[in-house]
Amino acid sequence: MKGLIVYSSLSGNTKKIAEAIAEVAEDSELISVREFQSSMLANFDLFYIGYWVDKGDCDAATLRLLAQLKDKRIVLFGTLGAAEQTEYYDRVKQQVESHAVHSHILGHFLCQGAVGEAVIARYQSMLAVHPQDEHIKQQLANYENGKSHPDEQDLANARAFAKSIG
């Protein structure tokens, strides 16, 4: 089965996961979403689609890509700034999968990634205005803890996930 790994990455986190998957996904090619062309659809049997989370959903470039994947076998993977919170992760997965209802989803991997400094600065500004806001404090703590992600364990988990797909 010939696979195509297509990723969208704002800060490099999803690219790292895509590269880890590419190490173990046999007979697969790795490209950025910017390199993807619809003419490629006929050349592959399996599509690994990597995204970064933007406000609880996949990024816009991935949305456009998913709209083109009708009746395809796909594997989803993504990164987000939040620490592993099962309920939130599940909501994100459901939301992203809702854009691929016309495809056969074989699996979905999600892990924490480091957040850009601009996002952290925005939350710090919000905290200055609302110093008692526990949600903002928790977000900043998550972002601080996430600076090392995706880490070696995340990459190992991504490889194991890809191997489980076959």
Give a label for each model feature:
Residues 1-2, 166:
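Short, Lys/Arg-enriched, disordered terminal segments
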Residues 2-24:
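N-terminal beta1-alpha1 ligand-phosphate binding loop
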Residues 6, 31, 77:
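The conserved SAM/SAH-binding core of class I Rossmann-like methyltransferase domains
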Residues 8-11, 35, 52-56:
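Short, surface-exposed acidic/glycine-rich loop or hinge patches that mediate macromolecular interfaces
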Residues 12, 37-39, 83, 117:
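Flexible, glycine-rich phosphate/dinucleotide-binding loops
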Residues 24-28, 46-49, 54-166:
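FMN-binding flavodoxin-like domain, especially the glycine-rich phosphate-binding loop
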